[in-house]
Amino acid sequence: MAQATDVLVVGGGLIGCGLAWRLRRKGSSVILVEASDINAGASGQNAGSLHFQLEHRFLEQDDASIRQAAPIVALSRLAVEDWRGLEAELHADLEVEMNGGLMVAETAEQITLLEKKQAREADFGLKTHLLDGDEARRIAPYLSGSILAAGHLPEEGHASPRAIAPALARAAVAEGADIMTHTRVVSVAKAAGGFRVGVQAPGGPLEVIQASCVVLAAGIGTGRLAEQFNLHLPLFAAPLTLTATERAAPFMPHLIQHVARRLSMKQTHSGNILIGGGWPSRFAQRADGGLNLQARPILDPDALIANLTIAAEVAPTVANLSVIRTWTGATTVTSDQLPLVGPVSRTPGVYVATGGSGFTLGPTFSRLLADLICGDQEAAQALAIVSPDRFGHLNSFMG
C-alpha cells in the first residue's frame, strides 16, 4: 500500500530540509527522501557565505546579463531578514555572523564596475556603500594597500554549512516530517490527485509514495530527476574548490569578495580562514568518457594556487597562515546563472529548487516555496525572477 503525503521533497540539503520544516509548521504532511545523508551535497560543502551584494559571476558578464540578474537583489533583501531570525526560530547555534561584507576593487576600471553594481542594487532597494581605499582599511585594517575602493554592505556575513541543514532536518522531524535517507527515486507515474513515486534504499523493498506535489531539490541530481517527470531543465554541475587555513586570532570579521576576481574569504568561529570564490576543480570521468558526478571532483592545483595568491594579495596576513585543508565539491548552475525555484507550469504539482545561491538564499527559497505550495500567490511574485517557466520552451517537444 502506498504512503500518502501532501508533499514529497526530494533532496536533504538546506532548501529541502527547510521546506519540510516550513510545510509541517503550516500543517502539510511531508515525506523527504535523500539519496545519501542529510547535508551530504553542496549545502554542506560550500563556504558558508552570506553574500547579498551581486556576485562576481554576474558582474563578469555583459551589461545585459547584469541587468537580467539584478532583480535577484530583491530576494537578497528578504534573505537578510530570514537569516537574522533563523537561529531564534530553530533554537540552534548556526554560527551566523552578520558583521558586514566588503567587495573590493584594485583598479579604476574595477571601481567603475563597483559603481555600476551599486546602481543596479539600489534599483531593487539594496543600499550598499561605496568606500575609498582608506575608508575600507579603517574598518578592515587587514586589507592590502592595493585596495582602492570597496562596496560595503553591513548585513553580509557567514554561517556554518555543517550546522544549518542538520538543524533544519531535526526541526522538521520534531514537527512530524518523515525523513528517509539513503533512499532514491526509482519510478514516477502520474496518478489521480498527484504522483505515485517509487523509492528504494539499497537492498530494500520498493516503497510507493502517493504525493499531491513533488519538490525536486536534489542539487546536481535535480536534472536527472526532472527527466523522470518528462522535463528538461538547463542545469549543469559545477565542480569547485575551497581551502581552510590554520586557526588564527580573530582579525577578519567581514566577508571579503572581489568585484573582478574570483575570491570569497572569511574567518570562521574557530579562527580558520575559508578561501574560495568559484575556482574550479575537475570531474572524474566514467569508463565511457562521461562525467562521473558521483565521485568527488579532482583538485586542480593551478586553480588552488591562483585562489590563494589572490587571497594573499587582498589580505596580506593570510600569506602567513598555513593551509590545513583543501576540498572539492559540486554545485548546480543554470544557463543564465540565476537559480531555478518554483512550480513547473507544464507539469502541475512539480516544483524545482536548485541552480545556485542555495546557501545565501536557501532559507528564503524554502519559506517562499512553502507559502506558495500552501496557496500564497504573493510568494509567486517574489519568486518570479527565478521561475523555471523562463525555460518552458525547452519542453515544447516533450509531449
Protein language model regions, located:
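Central helical "cap/lid" subdomain
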Residues: 40, 207-254
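Dinucleotide-binding Rossmann-like beta1-alpha1 core, especially the glycine-rich loop
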Residues: 49-135
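Helical element adjacent to the flavin cofactor pocket in flavoenzyme catalytic cores
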Residues: 151-212
